[in-house]
Amino acid sequence: MTPTTVVSAAALDAEPGLDAFGNDPWWIILIKALAVFVFLMLCVLMMIMADRKVMGRMQQRHGPNRFGPWGLLQSLADGVKLSLKEDLIPRTVDKVIYIAAPMIAAIPAFFAFSVIPVGPEVTMFGVETRLQLTDLPVAVLLVLATASLGVYGIVLAGWASRSPYPLLGGLRASAQVISYEIAMGLSFIAVFIYAGTLSTSGIVEAQQNIWFAVILFPSFVIYLITMIGETNRLPFDLPEGEGELVGGFMTEYSSMKFTMFFLAEYVNMVTVSAMSVTLFLGGYLAPPPITTFWPGANEGWWPALWWLIKFVCVMFLFVWVRGSLPRVRYDQLMKLGWKILIPIQLVWITAVAVIRVLNNQEYPGYVTAIVVGVFGLLVFLGLWAWSRAAAKAKAQEAAEHEAELRARRENPMYGGFPVPPMIAPHYGTSVLAEEPRYQPASAPKREEVSGA
């Protein structure tokens, strides 16, 4: 027995539902792998196109409408254009890391989608197989790990460019991913508590009766926020803020290397959207109103259609948020991640765990109600204390600001200026009246010497 067989047997013992994987013919696995790759590339092309068209409508303009019918081939044309551009490599870069960074950012993004279930078991070319490339007992952790690996490419791109703007963009990206991945992982924990498994197909099957987005709504909302921060999209696109860092970590890149960073960003968007459908929106299961009058809605290829509809709705959220919200400041980004999302998620997970234990132990309903009431009271007291502290800090900040304005009125040079203002005394046009202005002495007249 090989080590691989031993590991597979142990995985099947731990997760009985995984016995449907690993028994497909090699050509079925190859077809599914190619289908995943083609689907991701098509999603990237269509997402870029939808991004530009929807943004155009939200800004009361047409968007790209020249290349192809209704401009649908514009993304393909942009890709061809970028591939034909000159591939410039600055002289001072660390060449090996500079070239490897785009690949490090793009390749892990494709791996994560391999554990996303798109549908149940179907018949494909006469073979019974699931619409999922593979599954693992820790599939969700695999997605979380591969999503965080991409930031290494961003950080290395900033460092290898040997330029201040890319370096700052890389540092921002690493801090942002660390901050928001903690909150994202905490939102997964609530799902694990209710599903009892970390396998993606098992989590979908656990939502047969009710979606986790309903019973775990705070975790769902926090996940939606963190997935936007994880993919560096507006309003959290600080690593590539044009007004501050030109192009951020991509400033020194061109041609296909530049394209690979964009490819990684959009593939990550596809992955986190698919994960939100899997963890919170019932995956490929039909919405409950449909299953009440159509028992066969979750059979055959129909579940793939329900999954696709949910997936498109979540992807539209990225475009809608980008067109509606302005970019936040970096301190606001860090404050949201560390001071708001993580504390709320910790309190929520504690409440979910306690309620889950009480339900499993079959305690009376009034005990659960008392626990929920105590948690609600604690949350209310915490919010009240936080609001008082915030109001006090705001009043103190306003008082300090008023004192600074008063000091500036009394002394124009208060705080110092890189360039002195025009009212400073050493400008000739604004010298005080009582100070005598310097008058240069007149030059003596030359005496003409007459010849003898």
From Swiss-Prot:
For whether the record's keyword set contains Secreted, the answer is no
GO function term, MF aspect, one? quinone binding
What does the record list as GO biological process? aerobic respiration
What is the annotated localization of this protein?
A: Cell membrane
Reaction equation(s) it catalyzes: a quinone + NADH + 5 H(+)(in) = a quinol + NAD(+) + 4 H(+)(out)
Please verify whether the record's keywords include Cell membrane. Answer: yes
InterPro entries, per database record: NADH_UbQ_OxRdtase_su1/FPO (IPR001694), NADH_UbQ_OxRdtase_su1_CS (IPR018086)
Q: Name one GO cellular component term.
A: plasma membrane
TM ranges:
28-48, 96-116, 136-156, 177-197, 210-230, 264-286, 301-321, 335-355, 366-386
Catalytic activity, EC: 7.1.1.-
Chief site of localization: membrane
UniProtKB keywords: Cell membrane, Membrane, NAD, Quinone, Translocase, Transmembrane, Transmembrane helix, Ubiquinone
* Membrane protein topology class: Multi-pass membrane protein
Q: Pfam families attached here?
A: NADHdh
Tell me, what does this protein do in biology?
NDH-1 shuttles electrons from NADH, via FMN and iron-sulfur (Fe-S) centers, to quinones in the respiratory chain. The immediate electron acceptor for the enzyme in this species is believed to be ubiquinone. Couples the redox reaction to proton translocation (for every two electrons transferred, four hydrogen ions are translocated across the cytoplasmic membrane), and thus conserves the redox energy in a proton gradient. This subunit may bind ubiquinone.
Oligomeric state and interaction partners are given as: NDH-1 is composed of 14 different subunits. Subunits NuoA, H, J, K, L, M, N constitute the membrane sector of the complex.
In the record, the note on similarity to other proteins reads: Belongs to the complex I subunit 1 family.
Q: Tell me the protein's name.
A: NADH-quinone oxidoreductase subunit H
Q: Which organism is it from?
A: Thermobifida fusca (strain YX)
